[in-house]
Amino acid sequence: MTLAKIELLKQLLRDNEAKTVLKQTTVDQYNIIRKFNTSRIEKNPSLRMKWAMCSNFPLALTKGDMANRIPLEYKGIQLKTNAEDIGTKGQMCSIAAVTWWNTYGPIGDTEGFEKVYESFFLRKMRLDNATWGRITFGPVERVRKRVLLNPLTKEMPPDEASNVIMEILFPKEAGIPRESTWIHRELIKEKREKLKGTMITPIVLAYMLERELVARRRFLPVAGATSAEFIEMLHCLQGENWRQIYHPGGNKLTESRSQSMIVACRKIIRRSIVASNPLELAVEIANKTVIDTEPLKSCLTAIDGGDVACDIIRAALGLKIRQRQRFGRLELKRISGRGFKNDEEILIGNGTIQKIGIWDGEEEFHVRCGECRGILKKSKMRMEKLLINSAKKEDMKDLIILCMVFSQDTRMFQGVRGEINFLNRAGQLLSPMYQLQRYFLNRSNDLFDQWGYEESPKASELHGINELMNASDYTLKGVVVTKNVIDDFSSTETEKVSITKNLSLIKRTGEVIMGANDVSELESQAQLMITYDTPKMWEMGTTKELVQNTYQWVLKNLVTLKAQFLLGKEDMFQWDAFEAFESIIPQKMAGQYSGFARAVLKQMRDQEVMKTDQFIKLLPFCFSPPKLRSNGEPYQFLRLVLKGGGENFIEVRKGSPLFSYNPQTEVLTICGRMMSLKGKIEDEERNRSMGNAVLAGFLVSGKYDPDLGDFKTIEELEKLKPGEKANILLYQGKPVKVVKRKRYSALSNDISQGIKRQRMTVESMGWALS
């Protein structure tokens, strides 16, 4: 600045007005610079933000009642100024004002927040109820795996989720729902109810719903548990040299759905392989299987992974599967090479000759068994090299054995010492390669003794492994353990495969990648309810599953069954559904239970006292030919015991864990699942809970009497004393006066009159059912 300019400035400052303007309007304010800047594009956004936030009052408050609630200062800290922001015309305030507002500001209406941000509140619940253990320091072996980032309410493909979200938020604009959308109607209905009346913008609702329904998966380095409940807290559970023990609170719905899907697929395959056409039966059962309220096909489409059984059912239903090959517990993915199969006769160690398909050609595979991963190189009848990572001894041992068998090494064939005639759960003889697999998993010493040992490698990152799966100076020939991490399969590619009649999956190249023999024979209890809507499958289930499926079928066909019963059609007991139910009744009791159940139902029909819940309860027990006492009388029971012991019984005259009925709500509870009978019980029968078909214990004594007041409800009628009168609406809505009987001797007469009307109605439609 020149001397002349300084003189001019001093002269200007002598003018009080000019001095005030210059003092109050600082030219270093960013907003003023921006206002007179010709360019609208921000040249350096980062610098702009830093510059703004370094000033005392970088924020602008919109004028109004809310802004007035913030004081000028709090405990010596200035929160705002009365100066006006030139750019926004708002009041200027400091960043401390935000902290003050969050801490001391008014609390608005938060109704609906928990419903909208449910996934965040559930995360907080899991965190609040979590158990934290100690932190351990030291090297952590983390493996890159494809993991789900956060738990989901219900996993589904993105396009399906967008249709469901549209149906929840904009039902009028969504149009006619597709079948794939409509199968989620329970979820749609539940979410609509929850979100009704919330004042949050639809875009936020849509984002939060997407977070609950669409899976976000990433390849992340993980040590230990990989379920979404752990992955959402991964940042505070492990690092390169530390680990924190943590167990989340709450339940794991996604895992339950996936686990139930695996259980269902395994059972379907186990049932199908004994059929004349396994593929046809598997498709039929799979299309009629529901997990919770969702079709199995929808689960298989939405949920990533599963096991061999899931992939076989996917292929049967025409869905794509991940690029994998299976050999029992061993999972393989080809890295390079190609093999060609030729049938050869092989002399094995026990002196027998087996015809086996031998693979010729050099091949390299990425292999996995449980948590143990490795790289396998093989040629014709020889395992060249197997490099594995350190894991649980059981997984390491199984991986080594399965790779030795899969390689069809001559030493493996020579290691057989005993019989290799193994059967699957269906009682079918396994093929030779699966016989060998089963044999050596049970008798590993035969294989390791024959295999031989060699000196361990000298490299620092490699070590040998002995027959006890311990690090050693000598190692099983060709087998090496690396201290480095072998990452999990990273491919996400899917492919369409063809499936044979016997449930073998074949690639376009003709290579068999898995089959029914690769399905695990482990049996486990499903965490969610599985419904197989076909009697062909029911006998495979547990007692509870069979009870549930049978009674569900009875409810579905109740009108037909009831009509046939009232018309006296005895062949009505011979349904396929009841044949499956018979398999859970102890054999020596089946005839006695049938005789008893048929006698009770006949008595109900003859005395014309229809009790729908009792009819449903006893009907499945009537399948077997009835067995009576020597005098022709039926055996009597208060409890009908089923196979399996424990809670597997049905009480005849009261509720039990398997079957109970609430006449007030007209709800049946079958194995814990509620099923409504509303609309399936006639008004006359409903009133019989008070005594009879018309009104047990009451006599219709005339027309409506205004002096007696309003119409009484059934509950109020029960409180009347003998001889008292009241107005009621009869079952067809007819207003009448009734008097409570002093004696109950006419009870059966009341009942029979009502039932006769019901029976006449059924008989009039009998021609349609004959």
UniProtKB/Swiss-Prot annotation:
SUPFAM superfamilies per the UniProt record, alphabetical:
PB2 C-terminal domain-like
Per the record, GO CC terms? Answer: host cell nucleus; virion component
Instruction: Please give the chief subcellular localization of this protein.
Output: virion
Q: Which GO terms describe its molecular function?
A: RNA binding; RNA-directed RNA polymerase activity
One Pfam family here: Flu_PB2_3rd
Where it sits in the cell: the answer is: Virion; Host nucleus
Keyword annotations from UniProtKB, A to Z: Cap snatching, Eukaryotic host gene expression shutoff by virus, Eukaryotic host transcription shutoff by virus, Host gene expression shutoff by virus, Host nucleus, Host-virus interaction, Inhibition of host RNA polymerase II by virus, mRNA capping, mRNA processing, Viral transcription, Virion
- GO process terms (BP): 7-methylguanosine mRNA capping; cap snatching; DNA-templated transcription; symbiont-mediated suppression of host gene expression; symbiont-mediated suppression of host mRNA transcription via inhibition of RNA polymerase II activity; viral RNA genome replication
**InterPro entries hit by this protein:** Flu_PB2_2nd, Flu_PB2_6th, Flu_PB2_C, Flu_PB2_CAP-bd, Flu_PB2_middle, Flu_PB2_N, INV_PB2, PB2_helical
Q: The motif Nuclear localization signal: which residues?
A: 740-743
Record text on subunit structure and interactions: Influenza RNA polymerase is composed of three subunits: PB1, PB2 and PA. Interacts (via N-terminus) with PB1 (via C-terminus). Interacts with nucleoprotein NP (via N-terminus).
UniProt lists the family membership as follows: Belongs to the influenza viruses PB2 family.
Q: Tell me, what does this protein do in biology? A: Plays an essential role in transcription initiation and cap-stealing mechanism, in which cellular capped pre-mRNAs are used to generate primers for viral transcription. Recognizes and binds a wide range of cap structures of target pre-RNAs which are subsequently cleaved after 10-13 nucleotides by the viral protein PA. Plays a role in the initiation of the viral genome replication and modulates the activity of the ribonucleoprotein (RNP) complex.
Q: What is this protein called?
A: Polymerase basic protein 2
The gene name on file is PB2
